Regions:
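Short C-terminal beta-strand
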Residues: 176-186
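Hydrophobic alpha-helices of bacterial signal-transduction systems
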Residues: 185-193
Length: 193
């Protein structure tokens, strides 16, 4: 959890307590869920190795709910992941990075906001997880990033899967961007789930 995100969320909760206690409560409950889901990952060995996709989504869902309270009608979200893929092996924190990038560089700077979708499917024997947004798209983002997050994903994919793990970034036909991580599909084995 990025410190900047955490402090902004706490400041938003503080403000909403005065003006809209119900929304403050929703945001607070989602922050608690986000911290509960992400703290075990932060305490673990930190090897960056695979976990299961369901665990990754348990961090993403409350994160998106917090953003929906902050951005109000400007953010619409959907997660399309078949139940059978929740136990599939997937590298930790990669989906979170893609979601953060989509919001920070595509959706937040766009005055009317947009839609963010997370989708998982099996394509040619690989688990493909995509994060698509209808944000500003390539070359239009108001906040130019350093590219460290995407470079980190590429490096970790190379270390974990060699040439069998990929990150592709493409223009979304609906406007915005689609980022897809593809890794060999396999259900997670043992006690890591």
């Amino acid at each position: 959890v990025e410190p900047h995100f955490l402090f902004n969320t706490l400041a938003s909760i503080d403000h909403l307590i005065e003006v809209d206690p119900k929304r403050a409560s929703v945001m607070q409950k989602n922050l608690i869920a986000l911290l509960r889901a992400s703290m075990p990952t932060m305490r673990e060995a930190g090897d960056g190795g695979p976990r299961d996709l369901g665990r990754e989504l348990s961090v993403i869902r409350p994160y998106l709910e917090i953003l929906k309270v902050r951005m109000e009608e400007r953010l619409d979200t959907a997660i399309h992941v078949p139940e059978g893929l929740l136990s599939a092996e997937f590298p930790q924190m990669m989906v979170q990075t893609l979601v953060e990038n989509a919001v920070k560089h595509g959706l937040e700077p766009k005055p009317e906001g947009g839609r963010l979708e997370v989708k998982a499917e099996i394509v040619h024997g690989k688990l493909a997880v995509s994060v698509s947004d209808t944000g500003l798209g390539f070359g239009k983002a108001a906040t130019a990033g350093t590219g460290v997050g995407l470079a980190n994903i590429r490096e970790r994919l190379q270390l974990l899967y060699g040439t069998k793990g990929t990150l592709t970034i493409a223009e979304n036909p609906a406007g915005g961007t689609i980022a897809t991580i593809a890794v060999p599909y396999k259900p997670l084995q043992g006690d890591n789930a």
